[in-house]
Regions:
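Transmembrane beta-barrel strands of outer-membrane/channel proteins
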Residues: 181-189, 240-244, 290-296, 335-341, ...
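Face-selective signature of the C-terminal outer-membrane beta-barrel domain
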Residues: 275-298, 311-478, 603-613, 617-628
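N-terminal Sec signal peptide and the immediately downstream disordered periplasmic leader
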Residues: 1-60, 65-72, 131-134, 226-230, ...
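Gram-negative outer-membrane beta-barrel transporters
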Residues: 460-465, 567-576, 583-708
Length: 790
């Protein structure tokens, strides 16, 4: 039996697709075992994670967010995954170089997989209009992928509709020399982890209460994967991967106002993934790929203080794409046609939501709110056509050129639907309905045309290369003509790649948020007995954009040490936020979106690693140390994004001083300085691989909004919003993964892996409230992973 391995490499710009798609780049498992190493930090801003990189890293729930967690350009929302909710398996939000997490672009094989319906809303609260979403349209299982490339700076001109970065996932192609089937199982549970809980939260946590936070004191996670690679005919074959990731969480069914628990129930959190690619190497000139993809996510919830509030919330995405590569005499032409359906939904068990002064649930009586608000969903169908022409390299005098041109058209058919009528009201002491609102059944849509043209040229003279490019985008949603200049230069000082400098300027225009257009459609189905109405205005918005100045340095020190340094400066303009006002005459609440948001970010990282591993007694050792610093200031909450309503405030009180709001450090994703030591050990004779990450994070701050009852509130500044920062201590964490692939098994390739996250069981505070209640990161966690390849 043979095992396919792809050596870990760093790829850049236009070379990525060609290098990754080369069908002859495979080598045999029993001839040489891969030496695992930390993923290098590139100077050109493009980090490439091979399938071996994915196997090496402890990837937790197996999402793309987990894979990118240690990347120095990335910051996680430390308050999203904590000791309180470790049963959750959804992808976490990521910020790239200080940009909002909803302004990243996700792609699968080069086709957009971004959910731009309402990506900043990840609330699971029960509401008549709440449809939770996130920017990842497909919740991919990274164990099924061939590779993932993160473009965080110097992003090539073919990528657009983002402010932060681009994440491009590639599905595996078949390998004629490796017909095989692989089975995998991965698991953890609440008994295998340590939870750090504030004393003030312990009672609610142990009950498994829910509300703004869905506690998971008791859970089991079981992940199953199946993948295969099969040649069907000469030069024609298929790969496929299936996975189910499931978390079963036991929570309180109902908790009374007196804290009495009336029963417990099990709630499921499930993510299914199915990926397949048919490949036909028709000739030396033509290659065809047909890709099929599906992910489905469902989460069962209740609000434990509201009886009969059970609901299911989820996401379903599926699509197909056809790629044709044509090798011409003078160029390479790639044509892609695709269709993707991305949807989010909320489905309550009941259609009526009401509050009554006296209700009975089991043995509990008293005032309560109960019920649900029906079934509501929104979706978008994207129809994509794109083409790209790469000229062969040619010379004009002593200068070589390698230009490429491209065009893309996407038609987006977005719609929202309320599948049944629902209503909400309050029953007063007299037994009459008040605050009565009816949500009528309905469906509405909007269609958007998106056009893109781009071109770039790699110009080389001696040991200097320039990459000028320009991108044009237009859509009829906001009707803005956006021109994005892209420029990068590389100087190989001694023409031997020992000393290199990379620098450039780039502009990145963001993507549209479709919920702004769909919101008025949903609002038109709402009938308030009191006559209240809502209206949304967004039509005059500019497209938000980021300007980037970046520089990278690479220096080989001695024979085997490589040092790399990167600096990225980002300035975000025209970021979307909102303001609301009420017209009392018409009883209309008007929400107006504006371009008042702005941020400035300084990002720096420095890394040291070896060009070749150390060899000590049949053990290959690969060390790497990374220093990373990201600091942002601005008047925008990255988490709230376009739902942020504070940006109209020119001044605020910050730590007791009246200051300009845009001079205040950004509060979320605020983990400025991180230092990581990565150390991998590979013992080839036994098949043992031991990967380690030791990370130190400096003390940071949590932002608190002051109310008039807080001691730090300054009454003379009562006309201004007031904030203070509370210090959170520094932290040291150690994550490790030990894998064993017995070399004596010739017919079955068995791999057993164990992950220990936070080996030191560090108690790290990630947030605090204005009453001093702290939230902590998860403690020590064990995972077990077994796979077998036939």
């Amino acid at each position: 039996m043979k095992r396919v391995l792809i050596p870990g490499v760093i790829l850049c710009g236009a070379d990525v697709a060609q290098a990754v798609d080369d069908k002859n780049m495979y080598m045999h498992f029993f001839e040489e075992m891969t030496v695992y190493a930390p993923v290098p930090v590139p100077v050109n801003g493009n980090t490439h994670y091979t399938s071996e990189s994915i196997e090496r890293l402890p990837t937790g729930n197996g999402n793309i967010s987990d894979l990118l967690r240690t990347n120095p350009a990335v910051r996680m929302d430390s308050t999203q995954s904590t000791s309180l909710n470790q049963g959750d398996i959804r992808p976490e939000k990521i910020s790239i170089h200080g940009a909002s997490p909803y302004q990243n672009a996700y792609l699968i094989d080069g086709i957009s997989a971004t959910n731009n319906l309402n990506p900043a809303n990840e609330s699971d609260a029960s509401s008549a209009t709440n449809i939770s979403g996130m920017s990842q349209g497909y919740y991919l299982d990274v164990s099924l992928l061939d590779n993932v490339t993160l473009y965080d700076s110097f992003v090539p001109v073919e990528f657009g509709r983002f402010n932060g970065g681009v994440i491009d996932a590639k599905i595996k192609r078949f390998n004629a020399d490796d017909s095989s089937v692989k089975l995998g199982y991965r698991t953890t549970r609440s008994d295998w982890l340590t939870s750090h809980i504030d004393e003030n939260n312990k009672s609610a946590f142990n009950q498994g209460s829910s509300g703004s936070t869905y506690y998971s004191p008791d859970f089991k996670k079981n992940f199953y994967t199946l993948s295969f690679n099969q040649e069907l005919a000469d030069n024609f074959g298929v790969t496929a991967g299936l996975s189910r990731r499931q978390s079963d969480i036991t929570r309180a069914d109902y908790v009374s106002n007196d804290g009495i628990v009336a029963g417990r129930a099990q709630y499921k959190n499930v993510i299914d993934t199915a990926l397949s690619k048919f490949t036909w190497f028709a000739s030396d000139r033509f290659t065809h790929d047909l890709t099929l993809k599906y992910t489905g996510s469902s989460r069962d919830y209740n609000t434990s203080t509201f009886p009969q509030s059970d609901r299911e919330m989820g996401n379903k995405s599926y699509g197909l794409a056809w790629d044709m590569d044509t090798q011409l005499a003078w160029a390479k032409l790639r044509t892609t046609v695709g269709w993707d359906h991305i949807s989010d939904y909320t489905r309550h068990d009941h259609d009526t939501w009401y509050t009554e002064l006296s209700c009975t649930y089991g043995d509990i009586t008293g005032r309560c709110t109960r019920g649900g608000l029906g079934h509501i969903s929104q979706a978008v169908d994207n129809y994509t056509f794109k083409t790209r022409l790469d000229w062969q390299k040619f010379a004009v005098g002593n200068v070589s050129h390698q230009p490429y041109f491209g065009a893309e058209y996407i038609y987006s058919d977005a719609w929202t639907e309320r599948h049944n009528q629902s209503e909400s009201y309050v029953i007063n002491a007299a037994g009459k309905k008040t605050n009565h609102t009816i949500y009528h059944k309905g469906k509405g849509s909007l269609g958007i045309d998106n056009y893109t043209l781009y071109m770039a040229d790699r110009i080389s003279w001696r040991n200097v290369s320039l990459m000028p490019g320009v991108r044009y985008d237009y859509d009829n949603y906001l009707s803005n003509h956006n021109i994005s200049p892209r420029f990068m230069t590389e100087w190989d000082i001694f023409a031997d790649q020992t000393s290199m400098i990379t620098a450039g300027y780039n502009r990145y225009y963001g993507g549209n948020i479709l919920d702004m257009g769909l919101r008025d459609i949903r609002n038109s189905w709402t009938e308030s007995v009191s006559g209240n109405k809502t209206l949304t205005r967004y039509q005059d918005l500019k497209t938000p954009y980021n300007d980037e100045l970046a520089m990278g340095l690479q220096q080989k020190i001695g024979k085997n040490v490589i040092a790399r340094a990167n600096y990225v400066y980002r300035e975000a303009h025209d970021q979307i936020s909102k303001s609301s006002r009420t017209d009392s005459a018409t009883k209309t609440t008007i929400t107006e979106y504006n371009n008042d948001g702005k941020t400035k970010t300084h990002s720096f990282n420095l890394s040291f690693e070896l060009a070749e591993p150390l060899h000590i007694r049949q053990v290959d050792i690969n060390p790497q140390i990374v220093f990373s610093y990201i600091k942002s200031k601005g008047n925008l909450s990255l988490n709230n994004g376009y739902e942020e309503s504070n940006t109209g405030d020119n001044q605020v009180v910050y730590n007791g001083n009246l200051v300009s709001y845009d001079s205040v450090p950004v509060a979320d994703f605020n983990n400025p300085l991180k230092i990581s030591l990565n150390m991998d050990f590979t013992h080839q004779p036994s098949g043992l691989v031991w990967a380690n990450t030791l990370a130190w994070q400096e003390a940071r701050k949590a932002r608190i909004i002051l109310g008039k009852t807080n001691a730090q509130y300054i009454s003379e500044y009562s006309d201004y919003k007031q904030y203070v920062d509370e210090k959170l201590d520094s932290s040291l964490t150690w994550d490790t993964r030990l894998s064993w692939t017995p070399q004596f098994l010739q017919q079955q390739n068995l791999t057993i892996s164990a992950d220990i996250l936070n080996v030191l069981d560090s108690k790290t505070a990630v947030d605090t409230t204005n009453t001093g209640v702290a939230t902590y990161a998860s403690g020590r966690t064990f995972w077990l992973d077994v796979s077998m390849k036939f």
